[in-house]
């Protein structure tokens, strides 16, 4: 039988002798790695045990059904061909043109490398043309003709099996996408019915890549693998539901969690020995027999893609659409909490008080805002990260001595303007602020004399608005004491309270006295700012408190100072 098979195969395909050593060398990597090699089975004479009527019967069944599963498929085990490709390109499958066009994207790299692997020129290494008439067993009904047709079909489809295992990195997606679709137990898939009719779902469940094509009597191992894969995917779904509680963590934690689960699936499916074999097989970029990801493929596949394929999306023929659809499914399953404006206001108010609320504060906030405590905790983590990012960006964009974006502290650069001296010297950190203020004043009032020393001030890179001056202590500068500035402030209203600015600037002398008196109040205020977390929100709150204190100071001595002004 094997001699007849070799002779008829050679008569049908004259170039088969040049192919045989190529076939042997293309699978030498698999034999080194200890995997079942279909070439080894062929050389050992696996075809001898099959009589000619049985071979012709299975060949005719394959021709009628176009199915990858028969009751006993000798050539399928030898050909080492994925059932998905076998259905499209096998004898009787018709090698449909639309199937070839759809699979062209997945086999683009394999087509170019197949010509190199087979060692033959011409159409042997390319995407297969329509089948020759020798591959249709319906025309030959006798036993020898059927065997010859089977040999021709075997050699005809060998060029797909000899392609280097580059395009097989998607085999896990076929396996995982197809496995949850199977309504009956997988044993029914392997045995098949007496008529041998296989459903499309069963074809999908078998499409795990060339490494998992079962040998004769190797069906039970594949069944156990599929059952283990189903259980592992259910475990993955439960773990993903648990992971969604912390989905809005920082990005590095999220990526770590995504990378963790595909590795867990890989180890759970195979055990330590097969995992070591998978690590060795990564050099050849082939999938191991269980059809799981090798470590190299885990790095190549997007982590969200690998985790997101939970069998809910259908099998895609091209590799690009496969990853996109898995990613889309992943995005649909993950949800984000949308906070109302009231919830955000309350959370911001709590964040102003403390950046690190204890568990009681978080639970109280969660009860009040109708949120879970985990959501409140995640919001505070994200808010702290955003605050640190802004602080870092503020420290980079502003010079270190410029006080306005930074927090209030005991050594605030405004401290020289809070002492009792009526005309203190310039503080170098405020030079750009004075330049901006003088430029705005000169534009509004050309008759206003410039402040002393303004000609020697450095030009400001970005003019700061007058609203950055946080209190009346800044007005100790001589330019702010002239009455003309009162009209400027009353038109622009730069402070948080416009009435405070007008009251301070209508009477310049009480402004000086109020600023001097507020110097005594500066120490407890800055101590309170130190107790609070030093954030931008705390800075705004501090400015409001300072303006309120100055208003009270201006009202209390208002009668006596009014007489002095008159």
Swiss-Prot record:
Protein's recorded name: Homeobox protein ARX
Domain of life, per lineage: Eukaryota
Family matches, as InterPro entries: HD (IPR001356), Homeobox_CS (IPR017970), Homeodomain-like_sf (IPR009057), OAR_dom (IPR003654), Paired_Homeobox_TFs (IPR050649)
CDD domains the record matches: homeodomain (cd00086)
Listed Polar residues bias regions: 159-171
Biased amino acid composition, Low complexity: 144-154, 205-215
MF GO annotations: chromatin binding; DNA-binding transcription activator activity, RNA polymerase II-specific; DNA-binding transcription factor activity, RNA polymerase II-specific; DNA-binding transcription repressor activity, RNA polymerase II-specific; RNA polymerase II cis-regulatory region sequence-specific DNA binding; RNA polymerase II transcription regulatory region sequence-specific DNA binding; sequence-specific double-stranded DNA binding
The keyword Cytoplasm is assigned to this record: no
GO BP annotations, alphabetical order: axon guidance; cell proliferation in forebrain; cerebral cortex GABAergic interneuron migration; cerebral cortex tangential migration; embryonic olfactory bulb interneuron precursor migration; epithelial cell fate commitment; forebrain development; globus pallidus development
Record field: compositional bias (Pro residues): 126-135
One Pfam family cited in the UniProt record for this chain: Homeodomain
DNA-binding region: 332-391
Region feature (Disordered): 1-21, 50-79, 119-264, 286-319
Entry's Gene Ontology cellular component terms: nucleus
Keyword Transit peptide annotated: no
């Amino acid at each position: 039988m094997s001699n007849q098979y070799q002779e008829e195969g050679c008569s049908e395909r004259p170039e088969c002798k040049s192919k045989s050593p190529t076939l042997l060398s293309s699978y030498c990597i698999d034999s080194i790695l200890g995997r079942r090699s279909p070439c080894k089975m062929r050389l050992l004479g696996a075809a001898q045990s099959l009589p000619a009527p049985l071979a012709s019967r299975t060949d005719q069944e394959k021709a009628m059904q176009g199915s990858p599963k028969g009751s006993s498929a000798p050539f399928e085990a030898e050909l080492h061909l994925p059932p998905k490709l076998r259905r499209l390109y096998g004898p009787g499958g018709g090698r449909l043109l639309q199937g070839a066009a759809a699979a062209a994207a997945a086999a683009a790299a394999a087509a170019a490398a197949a010509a190199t692997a087979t060692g033959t020129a011409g159409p042997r290494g390319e995407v297969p043309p329509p089948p020759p008439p020798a591959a249709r067993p319906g025309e030959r009904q006798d036993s020898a003709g059927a065997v010859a047709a089977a040999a021709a079909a075997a050699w005809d489809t060998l060029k797909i099996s000899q392609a280097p295992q580059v395009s097989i990195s998607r085999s896990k997606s076929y396996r995982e996408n197809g496995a949850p679709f199977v309504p009956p137990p997988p044993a029914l898939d392997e045995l098949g019915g007496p008529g041998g009719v296989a459903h499309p779902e069963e074809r999908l469940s078998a499409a795990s890549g060339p490494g998992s094509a079962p040998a004769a009597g190797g069906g039970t191992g594949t069944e156990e693998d599929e059952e283990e894969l189903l259980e592992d995917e259910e475990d993955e779904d439960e773990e993903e539901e648990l992971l969604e509680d912390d989905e809005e963590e920082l990005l590095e934690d999220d990526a770590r969690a995504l990378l963790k689960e595909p590795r867990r699936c890989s180890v759970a499916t195979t055990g330590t020995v097969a995992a070591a074999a998978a690590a060795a097989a990564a050099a050849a970029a082939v999938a191991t027999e269980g059809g799981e990801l090798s470590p190299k493929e885990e790095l190549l596949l997007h982590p969200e893609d690998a985790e997101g394929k939970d069998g809910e999306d259908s099998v895609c023929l091209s590799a690009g659409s496969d990853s996109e659809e898995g990613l889309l499914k992943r995005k649909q399953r993950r949800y984000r909490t949308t906070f109302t404006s009231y919830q955000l206001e309350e959370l911001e108010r709590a964040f102003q008080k403390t950046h690190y609320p204890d568990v009681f504060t978080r639970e109280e906030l969660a009860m009040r805002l109708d949120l879970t405590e985990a959501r409140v905790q995640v919001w505070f983590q994200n808010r702290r990260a955003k605050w640190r990012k802004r602080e870092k960006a503020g420290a980079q964009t502003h010079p270190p001595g410029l006080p306005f974006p930074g927090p209030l502290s005991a050594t605030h650069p405004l401290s020289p303007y809070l002492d009792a001296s009526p005309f203190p010297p310039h503080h170098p950190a405020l030079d750009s602020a004075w330049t901006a203020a003088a430029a705005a004043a000169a534009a509004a009032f050309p008759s206003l004399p410039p402040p002393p020393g303004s000609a020697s001030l450095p030009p400001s890179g970005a003019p700061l608005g007058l609203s950055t001056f946080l209190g009346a202590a800044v007005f100790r500068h001589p330019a702010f004491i002239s009455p003309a500035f009162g009209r400027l402030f009353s038109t622009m209203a730069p402070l948080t309270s416009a009435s405070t600015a007008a009251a301070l600037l209508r009477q310049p002398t009480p402004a000086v006295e109020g600023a001097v008196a507020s110097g005594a109040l500066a120490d407890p205020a800055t101590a309170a700012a130190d107790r609070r977390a030093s954030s931008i929100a705390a800075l705004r709150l501090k400015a409001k408190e300072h303006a309120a204190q100055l208003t009270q100071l201006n009202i209390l001595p208002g009668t006596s100072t009014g007489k002095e002004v008159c």
